[in-house]
Curated annotation (Swiss-Prot):
The lineage of its organism: Eukaryota, Fungi, Dikarya, Basidiomycota, Agaricomycotina. Signal peptide: none annotated. This is Polyphenol oxidase 1. It comes from Agaricus bisporus (White button mushroom). The gene is PPO1. It holds the Pfam family Tyrosinase. Heterotetramer. InterPro entries: Di-copper_centre_dom_sf (IPR008922), Monophenol_mOase_fun (IPR016216), Tyrosinase/Hemocyanin (IPR050316), Tyrosinase_C (IPR041640), Tyrosinase_Cu-bd (IPR002227). It catalyses: 2 L-dopa + O2 = 2 L-dopaquinone + 2 H2O; L-tyrosine + O2 = L-dopaquinone + H2O. PROSITE patterns: TYROSINASE_1, TYROSINASE_2.
Length: 568
């Protein structure tokens, strides 16, 4: 039997569009909705079905497309499907994952376009140019209604008529949850759920809570993303939430990615790696993760996949197996006999897609690309500064048109000038301690009595979310992440600067933290260690982004408190 190959997309290099712009493009959105419906309807035992592709990440516990390892699955390996979480392969393994879904949807879109009786040539062109959209949560933490709240959407069908149809982006409906062998609570839910209002059989999406949680996380998400671009310079620190040697002062791409999973899922599917891809928002999320990888790589163009280990193993990688840029990225077949490897996946253009920030750039001029992308990162995610203007991408068509509007100068932007101190909380823990996803919530000021209010509290500085399979294990997996603090201080206090003599007393007096399980209950985390660090930084008028110096650890701020720094 031949394999389903992950192949470069046809139609030339086309940009993936941000979902807020994508839903305004009638042809692209109409084809996407119909193609997704067709993929959902594909029999579950077929490799190109949504059920099979989503199941690659974890459940059901079956091989995908005959991709098996060189040895039998080891009992010491904790089943995680094929995905390479906690590994230096995390960014590169997920690139063909989004691509295979995009490839299948593209095929459906082209077949659908051929059935249009009105303006067929335009629909066929739109289908050829179709690329999967991404959700830029670092700029727009709350997705558009077409993704999270509209049970029906209006599309143009092949007869040229506007028609209201069920919205496939809201949820995926299982033929039978028994087909996946899921554990509770997923074995009693017929559809995927986001921030469900209970764990019972009749649980429903809680859209209002989803919006509130995501909105309250916006400032922290934006800042964490910006810091990742500016401070993370090596592949081990960039690629994985597993602590790497040499120390880091900012979140990895995987750590930020974890935050989105738990914020969207709550106690629902997106919060559990074993079932997360069944929620269609997973691929909007991971398309953006892929975009951030492309942007970071354009800035750090001399850095790519470095050696590491497979952590707890996968269906084809043994426990702690050494991995590098030549490791097979199973189950993604490049040919009938070979898998894709990380060193073959560096260029998105070679795979048939790009992102709006790269449109019109000469990708062979790496220094020029570096400067342009650095500037765009500052415009998209950096605090607005005097004289700087924000980038607005107008992607109503398949080509990027850039316009500019005056930027509002935020209070954070006013304080980040010249020499300044950038404050963060370093969060360490054993991700497997409690057997489910959880959130370490950092507060300045009073903490609400009701744990359900923690993630929407105005006193929440930010949170570090652990994205964990809901099964207990004795394996210890230390994880590290960071919660930026400056943006909260700027917007909620009257401090004139981030100077040590001003900020340190504020943190020593008012800083508190709590642990919230995915099911909404509070917990104690014995492995938790919260340490405050200050990164001396400098922002000049001739550079778009600040330069950082070695961090200073203020261990005394949290030492002696439960979950605080263990060293004095």
């Amino acid at each position: 039997m031949s394999h389903l190959l992950v192949s470069p997309l046809g139609g030339g290099v086309q940009p993936r569009l941000e979902i807020n712009n994508f839903v305004k493009n009638d042809r692209q959105f109409s084809l996407y909705v119909q193609a997704l419906d067709r993929m959902y309807a594909t029999p579950q035992n077929e490799t190109a079905s949504y059920f099979q592709v989503a199941g690659v990440h974890g459940y059901p516990l079956i091989p995908f497309d005959d991709a098996v390892g060189p040895t039998e699955f080891s009992p010491f390996d904790q089943w995680t499907g094929y995905c390479t979480h906690g590994s230096t392969l995390f960014p590169t393994w997920h690139r063909p994952y989004v691509l295979i879904l995009e490839q299948i949807l593209s095929g459906h879109a082209q077949q659908i376009a051929d059935t249009y009786t009105v303006n067929k040539s335009e629909w066929k062109k739109a289908a050829t140019e179709f690329r999967h959209p991404y959700w830029d949560w670092a700029s727009n933490s709350v997705p558009p209604p077409e993704v999270i709240s509209l049970p029906k959407v209006t599309i143009t069908t092949p007869n040229g008529q506007k028609t209201s149809v069920a919205n496939p982006l809201m949820r995926y409906t299982f033929n039978s949850v028994n087909d996946g062998g899921f554990y509770g609570p997923y074995n009693q839910w017929d559809t995927t759920l986001r921030q469900p209002d209970s764990t019972g059989v009749n649980a429903k999406d809680n859209v209002n809570r989803l919006k509130s949680v995501l909105k309250n996380a916006q400032a922290s998400l934006t800042r964490a993303t910006y810091d990742m671009f500016n401070r993370v310079t090596t592949w081990p620190h960039f690629s994985s939430h597993t602590p790497a040697s040499g120390g880091s002062t900012s979140n990895s791409i995987e750590a930020i990615h974890d935050n989105i999973h738990v914020l969207v899922g709550g106690n629902g599917h997106m919060s559990d790696p074993s079932v997360a891809p069944f929620d269609p928002i997973f691929f909007l999320h991971h398309a953006n993760v892929d975009r951030l990888i492309a942007l970071w790589s354009a800035i750090r163009y001399d850095v790519w996949t470095s050696p590491g280990d497979a952590q707890f193993g996968t269906y084809t990688l043994r426990y702690k197996q050494s991995v590098d840029e030549s490791t097979d990225l199973a189950p993604w077949w490049k040919t009938q006999n070979e898998y894709w490897k990380s060193n073959e996946l560096r260029s998105t253009e070679s795979l048939g897609y790009t992102y709006p920030e790269f449109v019109g750039l000469d990708m062979y001029n790496k220094d020029a690309v570096n400067k342009t992308i650095s500037r765009k990162v500052a415009q998209l995610y950096g605090p607005q500064r005097g004289g700087q203007r924000s980038l607005v991408e107008d992607l109503s068509n398949s080509h990027a048109r850039r316009s500019q509007r005056p930027a509002k100068r935020s209070r954070l932007g006013q304080l980040l000038k010249g020499l300044f101190s950038d404050w963060s909380a370093q969060i360490k823990f054993n991700r497997h301690e409690v057997g489910q996803s959880f959130s370490v919530c950092l507060f300045l000021g009073n903490v609400p009595e009701d744990p359900r209010e923690w993630l929407v509290s105005p006193n929440l500085v930010g949170a570090r979310h652990a994205f964990v399979r809901s099964v207990k294990t004795d394996h210890v997996a230390e994880e590290i992440g960071f919660i930026p603090i400056n943006q909260w201080i700027a917007e909620h206090t009257g401090l004139p600067s981030f100077a040590v003599d001003l900020v340190k007393p504020l943190l020593a007096q008012g800083l508190q933290w709590r642990v919230l399980l995915a099911d909404g209950t509070p917990a104690e985390l014995d492995s938790l260690e919260v340490t405050i660090l200050e990164v001396p930084s400098e922002l000049t008028d001739d550079e778009p982004n600040p330069r950082s110096r070695p961090p200073r650890y203020h261990k005394d701020i949290t030492h002696g408190k439960r979950g605080g720094c263990r060293e004095a």
